[in-house]
Amino acid sequence: MKILLRLGAAVLIAAVVFATLGPPRYRPHSPLGQDGEHALAFVLVGLAVGLAFPRRKLLVAAVSVALIGLLEIMQLWAPGRHARLEDFVVDAVTACVGLVGAAVLGWLAARWRGSASQ
């Protein structure tokens, strides 16, 4: 199960990196708008990474925020892309929301397993 969670997280991260740095014409668009799309993508990334690496919560959060910052900076060299502080804040905060969601799910699963064994 751990391998599947990590593989899923890697695929999701790769998709977000491509959507962020790839040609703008290939970026998916939705009725959520730019901030909504960013929020959804990074909540899912945070959730996936948090489920894939549940024992290193603070390290995963710190690395996630740092890599999100790097991803935003890399847009300075991507044609047709732009780096914005607002995007970094939305992406970092929503990734952390996803990480908290993963921690809550882990806590609930542990409680459920504990009550099922009694």
Go through the PLM ranges and name each one.
Residues 1-88, 92, 96-118:
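Bulky hydrophobic segments
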